[in-house]
């Protein structure tokens, strides 16, 4: 199993954000010692006219605006292809919650994915930070990248019914015939994407284009410099923006880092190893209870998990939902739960349902949440956007042997995710069959100007492993904040040590110590 898992935002961060961040001493907003590396901020490509927009009510994007009455929203038009600025345009949805006091500038946030909506994130975050120095001194701004969320055109490759059918297929048979089937499913998905969205749109959906979009949003805000907080995939976007538009960055925090120098296969293997670590942490916690469905013998945790989940390849598990629990949904639900200990109880409940032959519906709920399926059976486009962006962000090997070798390595580093035995064959990843060529290649991040960036990395982060943060901080020449925890991302999730360091940096440019380490 070599597919990448989407790097989702940690929604629980919004619950505690407002509790720790008030009352910090203030200084003038410019960052002391901020200098630019030679050549940074150069922007090749055809000239594009600065966007014009009007700020209006957010009801077009947000159903309930009662808690964000001061918020204003707009759409910013950007060229689908920046080499043809007068051609087809995409419209980016943007939300801005204005600072309540002396304004230091705009703080743009990106929740990750790729595919997650920053408009929705800001709408949820703003009420939680209403009484803090962040919203007192910064406009809180989110924009949905091209194809994502409330931006148009929305990238959709599947109907709701087609996505449901996709989830019912276990795609676990790695015999030659099974591999042929999986690759045919991937080819059909890729072709559906091209047929429904067009080759040109897919060729320009990548992070390189989104970084240019972000600068168009900066211009629409009227600011020469922005502040930026990127979670997960948002760190990749931040790094790309810094590389192209470094002179327009005042302060940037990258949490849950992606190493831009790593190949897709190596990134996938590293991520799978991270999920295995998180699984082990979950199982150890579960084993404190005699009712744990995985038992108390650590040597048997993986085997017991497979004994519960693998039979779903042949027959769905019981749920109150008539769909039942497929093998794919059980795996996806497990992955979702491993993003945060706050979700572990739902994983335990679902596994107990499988063990007892009763309702395993909590795993289905977790899978629906991950895949963006609502109670009416309608899907967000998060997953389609995730696939389309990652497939053009880096070239993926088409050689089947590379994926057989990857499957063998993944079975070693993440046995809980590996169905059956190694067969000597394995399907290529969706991106290896994607008809649109990659528009970027992996490369180390260039050193940032002094004081431009702070990197945060969590020791047992399943989706963006800790070492990626270490490596990105080294490439950028940036200080690293280490959080000792088992979760995906840490900033504004209630840890006083992390949050205070980040707040001081945004407010007055105070950099954390080079190797700051924060306990849970």
Swiss-Prot record:
Domain of life: Bacteria
This protein's UniProt keywords: Cell membrane, Hydrolase, Membrane, Signal, Transmembrane, Transmembrane helix
Enzyme class: hydrolase
EC number: 3.4.-.-
Chief place where the protein resides: membrane
Location of this chain's protein in the cell: Cell membrane
PANTHER family (UniProt xref): 2-SUCCINYL-6-HYDROXY-2,4-CYCLOHEXADIENE-1-CARBOXYLATE SYNTHASE, TRIPEPTIDYL AMINOPEPTIDASE
Protein name: Putative hydrolase Mb2247c
């Amino acid at each position: 199993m070599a597919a990448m898992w989407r790097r989702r935002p940690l929604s629980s961060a919004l619950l505690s954000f407002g509790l720790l961040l008030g009352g910090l001493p203030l200084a003038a907003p410019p960052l002391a010692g901020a200098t630019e590396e030679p050549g940074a901020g150069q922007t090749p490509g055809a000239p594009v006219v600065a966007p014009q927009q009007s700020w209006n009510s957010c009801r077009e994007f947000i159903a309930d605006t009662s808690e964000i009455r001061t918020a204003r929203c707009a759409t910013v038009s950007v060229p689908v292809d920046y080499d043809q600025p007068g051609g087809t345009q995409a419209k980016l949805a943007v939300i801005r919650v204005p600072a309540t006091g002396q304004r230091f500038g705009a703080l743009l946030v990106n929740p990750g994915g790729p595919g997650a909506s920053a408009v929705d994130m800001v709408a949820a975050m703003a009420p939680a930070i209403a009484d803090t120095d962040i919203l007192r001194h910064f406009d809180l701004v989110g924009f949905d990248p091209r194809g994502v969320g409330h931006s148009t055109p929305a990238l959709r490759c599947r109907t709701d019914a087609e996505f449901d059918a996709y989830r019912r297929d276990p795609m676990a048979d790695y015999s030659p015939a099974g591999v042929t089937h999986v690759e045919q499913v991937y080819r059909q998905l890729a072709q559906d994407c091209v047929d429904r969205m067009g080759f040109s749109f897919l060729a320009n959906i990548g992070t390189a284009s989104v970084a240019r979009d972000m600068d168009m949003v900066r211009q629409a805000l009227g600011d020469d410099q922005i502040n930026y907080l990127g979670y997960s995939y948002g760190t990749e976007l931040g790094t790309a923006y810094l590389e192209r538009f470094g002179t327009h960055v005042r302060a940037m925090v990258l949490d849950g880092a992606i190493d831009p120098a790593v190949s897709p296969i190596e990134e996938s293997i590293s991520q799978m190893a991270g999920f295995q670590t998180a699984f082990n942490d979950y199982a150890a916690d579960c084993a404190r209870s005699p009712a744990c469905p995985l038992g108390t013998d650590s040597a048997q945790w993986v085997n017991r998990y497979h004994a519960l989940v693998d039979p779903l390849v042949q027959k769905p598990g019981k749920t109150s939902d008539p769909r039942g629990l497929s093998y794919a949904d059980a795996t996806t639900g497990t992955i979702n739960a491993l993003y945060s200990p706050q979700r572990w109880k739902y994983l335990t409940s679902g596994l107990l349902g499988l063990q007892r032959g009763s309702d395993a519906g909590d795993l289905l709920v977790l899978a629906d949440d991950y895949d963006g399926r609502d109670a009416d059976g309608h899907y967000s486009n998060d997953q389609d956007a995730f696939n389309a962006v990652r497939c053009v962000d880096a070239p993926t090997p088409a050689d089947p042997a590379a994926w057989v070798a990857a499957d063998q390595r993944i079975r070693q580093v993440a046995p809980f995710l590996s169905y059956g035995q190694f067969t000597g064959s394995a399907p290529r990843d969706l991106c290896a069959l994607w008809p649109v060529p990659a528009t970027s290649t992996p490369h180390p991040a260039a050193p940032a100007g002094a004081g431009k960036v702070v990197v945060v990395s969590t020791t047992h982060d399943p989706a963006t492993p800790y070492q990626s943060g270490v490596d990105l901080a080294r490439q950028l020449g940036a200080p690293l904040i280490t959080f000792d925890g088992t979760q995906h991302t840490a900033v504004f999730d209630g840890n006083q040590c992390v949050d205070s360091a980040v707040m001081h940096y945004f407010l007055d440019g105070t950099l954390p110590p080079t190797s700051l380490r924060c306990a849970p």
